[in-house]
Amino acid sequence: MGANPHIFRQLEPLGTGHAIMCAASILEGPTVVAYADTLIRADLSLDPAADAVIWVKEVEQPEAFGVVQLNEENTIVNLVEKPKEFVSDLAVIGIYYFREIEVLKAVLQEVVKQSLQEGEEYQINQGILAMMEQGKVFKAGKVNAWMDCGNPEVTLQTNAEMLQFKKEEGETLVDPSAIMENSRLIPPCFVGKGARISNSTIGPGVSIGEGTIIENCELQNSLIQNHSHLINIKCEKAMIGNHVRYKGNPTFVSLGDYSEMQ
């Protein structure tokens, strides 16, 4: 399936329904809606009987999520946001398929007309529940792994999980042009093109970007972007942007692009 990307900006935080309607001018036909901070591993095949698919994952604390209830035919019969009492342990992960996105667009337009005050949020769930009331068939898609990138802590965890998946699949994670001098690499780790690591112990769960230099460091569970320079750091959790120069000894650090700190 080919992709024809467009970018629309949501200038005000008015909910997930509003975010979708920011792209109203191009909403037509089969459409996937996916939250940008979510990574999954799943079979994304579609049920031909479905008007829409919502991908879900079993969770230990369903009260923190939107959850779905299913019948024996894997059809979604209810959608509840952060239930106070147990409804289901199948959490909505933020990836949806609509066979005809125009239907969702129309019901969200009605939500705006009928019930919203100016500046009030509206959510995709309101549109989905309205579609279910119209008799639209929503099926549940299951995912094998659901990884979040919503904050630095979980992003580092997701990076480590992705590295492990890539290792198990036999993918080459260390670029042949990377230089290792008197250093130890504990897999899984990614080392990008032209990176140079000297007198350091790296891993597990570390990604080092293209052209980055690591000197006299001990790094675990860290994400280092491109063309940065780290010196004398012993750190278990680091998120470092592009073109950063950092010298220090933290247990956790998060620095954006073009930062310098000594």
List the predicted regions and their residue ranges.
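Fold-independent oxyanion-binding glycine-rich loops
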Residues: 10-11, 35-37, 56-59, 72, ...
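Conserved beta-loop-beta/alpha segment of the NTase-like Rossmann-fold superfamily
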Residues: 1-72
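Structural signal for interior beta-strand "rungs" in well-ordered beta-sheet cores
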Residues: 172-262
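Extended, small-residue-rich solenoid/repeat segments and analogous flexible loops
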Residues: 129-205
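Short beta-strand-to-turn element immediately C-terminal to the catalytic PLP-Schiff-base lysine
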Residues: 68-71, 97-99, 241, 247
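Catalytic-core segments of class I nucleotidyltransferases/pyrophosphorylases
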Residues: 75-164
